[in-house]
Amino acid sequence: MGRDVVLTKAVSRIVCLNPSQTETLVDLGLEEHIVGVTKFCVHPSHIRKVKTVVGGTKKVNFDKIQKLNPDIVLCNKEENTQEIVETLEKEYPVHVTDVSNLQDTLEMLHQYGLLFNCSQNAEKLCVRILLEKKQFDTFMKAKTKKKVAYFIWQNPYMVAGKDTFIHHMLEINGFENAFAHQDRYPTVSLEELSDLSLDLILLSTEPFPFKETHQKELQELLGIEVKLVDGEYFSWYGSRMLGAFQYFRSLHGH
């Protein structure tokens, strides 16, 4: 995000306030250096049991973070609030990611490699992600493009628009995002959807936990195919992308 992060010593204590980034740190071989995570850092499954949980992504316990005495705090522009970042950077070096596409992910990995002296592992991860992407692109060549709406919330209904990582992943999947002309996460009505000639509606399992009951209800109301999809593979960047392309294959049919 164009911020200078000044480190006066090698990093040995990391507080990470974003689930995607926590998982990525572990996959880069840095688990021993993580001292604090959020309650939403669910991967790997044991991480919240062995590290201090300092709150959520929008509200953190600053006293807990202070007791952990971190060398650096890792944040994300979308997940964490400006208030959290500004409060923390008065006391600690803070690195803030702004990830909306694959290139941003690769840049984040490159920066982590430099910050945490793990450039070799970071480079290997980048190469693996790019290889998976290349193979998936080949797989997708024969697929028909579908016009979709990707739901992230209910009451009110909200969908993914442009300038989001989800939108980028929809593009990689060969989907035409019906809300590509709108910014971020617009609110929509079911009446609006009827006029869009959609081929498919995708209901994400996060942040709102859409279930099969929602899927069946919307399908009956709109008469459009509705699929329940794993939101982690559409919205988590970093090492989660390694498994994403295999998951996407299953969505499109092997």
What are these regions, as identified by a protein language model?
Residues 1-254:
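N-terminal ligand-binding lobe of clamshell/alpha-beta domains
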